[in-house]
Design a protein with these regions (language model features):
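Basic, flexible Lys/Arg- and Gly-enriched helix-loop patches that mediate nucleic-acid binding at interfaces
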Residues: 1-233
Length: 233
């Protein structure tokens, strides 16, 4: 891999900025200053530093975000705060959220630059489970839970697919679905005459929101988490 391309991928700089850094002698490879932008780097074995700071190469990047309410799931927006604003300190280009959580919805959101993984996780054919904590306006009955689990008419061509429903309180359920239709959870509860007051995604496939990850916080996925979620596709 060219040295300037390596810098773009690991330091979050533009190609022009990378070339300028190389010319200024700010880059060292295996302890030796390297001033050739087209120098071939062995990305998995060479030690590269930028102004003395070591750079590590990863083909793709994966972050777990505890999305707070009040921000939208988008890469950019001129009027609203987005989930990507929370990760603005990460010097990684081309990151995007996998799927969408409504502005008022909290919980687990995967941020990555791995398009293939995102496609597989979101594909209806892959049947990746997504679990939500749902708090509703009115008491939810066992009959309501049965209807939700069997599938309900939310105004689309087809009813929703079967879901897993666990009633945990009078006005609170755990709902696991495999689809990702527009406002699906809210529309499902409307279909049984109720209204969602609070919605939080707890898991997506094998990836589960840790209890100690506070709202608005994020962290990189561990190697084990990456391995498992790639197995979900």
């Amino acid at each position: 891999m060219r040295l300037d391309k390596f810098l773009c991928d690991t330091a979050g700089v533009t190609r022009t900025e990378a070339k300028n850094a190389v010319k200024k002698g700010q880059i060292a490879v295996n302890g030796q200053v390297q001033k050739a932008a087209d120098y071939k780097v062995k990305e998995n074995t060479d030690t590269v530093t930028f102004q003395g700071r070591p750079l590590s190469y990863a083909a793709f990047h994966y972050y777990m975000l505890h999305k707070p309410a009040g921000v939208i799931t988008a890469t950019e927006d001129k009027k609203e705060s987005t989930v990507m604003d929370i990760l603005r300190e990460e010097k990684v280009k081309n990151l995007f959220p996998v799927g969408r959580l409504d502005k008022d919805t909290e919980g687990l959101l995967l941020i990555t630059d791995d398009g293939e993984l995102a496609h597989n996780l979101l594909s209806p054919k892959k049947h990746v489970d997504k679990e939500y904590l749902v708090k509703v306006r009115d008491s939810i009955s066992e009959d309501d839970c049965r209807k939700l689990s069997e599938g309900v008419d939310i105004g689309d061509e087809k009813p929703t697919a079967p879901a897993k429903v666990e009633r945990v309180a009078e006005k609170e359920i755990l709902l696991t679905i495999r689809e990702g239709r527009f406002h699906q959870v809210k529309r499902m509860l409307q279909a049984v005459g109720n209204e969602v007051l609070y919605l939080k995604r707890l898991s997506m496939g094998s990836l589960r929101l840790p209890k100690d990850l506070e709202k608005g916080a994020y962290r990189p996925l561990s190697e084990e988490e990456i391995y498992k979620i790639k197995g979900d596709k």
